[in-house]
Amino acid sequence: NDLATTDNQLLSEWDYEQNKLKPTEVSRTSAKRAWWKCRHGHSWSMKINERTILNKGCRICEQEYLSLFPALAVSYYSNKKGLKAELGSDRLLGVPLETYIPSEKLAIESGSADENIEIMKAYMCKQRGIRLIKLPMKGTELDYANNLKKAFQSVHIFISSDTEEDVEIIKNTYHEWKLCPNTFPLQVMGCRRKGTYIICF
């Protein structure tokens, strides 16, 4: 059985220009590398069996998703507890905070910018009575979500939910947004746009 027959859903991602072979000339278990092109125009090379059996997708889209996951997770859990969260707001410090929950005076950051900016953020948060939690994205989304729940618990915000289900909802919301960026499903995360940043309720 050829790829075109067994995995016809992947035909739209097969890069017909860069591949010498056609989907009708290879099988889903092949270890040959092929070129793929996602619906967003990203092109990448991957073994056919990685794409079919391991269900790996576009590396660029995956990196984008993982870079946004921490902020999306904070807004998702904030929304579950009826809390407003601001994503990427610079209104407090003059430099953007990745996520900020005003009612709790809580900022959660996953990335690390320039060391001087990080020192300045920590100092300015302390001066304003804002608790700054550094929670780097390590491991899987599930690991991060579990660690985030523990971080919330440390400030007496208790979230009891199925973490695997939470991660799936966050991932699906992200993919919906990628399909229709102009109609980002903000309401799913309890969010709305305000100027250059997003507020989540």
Whereabouts are the PLM-identified features?
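Basic, amphipathic alpha-helical patches used to engage nucleic acids or provide basic targeting signals
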Residues: S103-K149
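Surface-exposed, proline-enriched loop/turn segments that connect beta strands in immunoglobulin-like
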Residues: E86-G88
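Short, solvent-exposed polar/charged micro-motifs at secondary-structure junctions
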Residues: G94-E98, Y144-N146
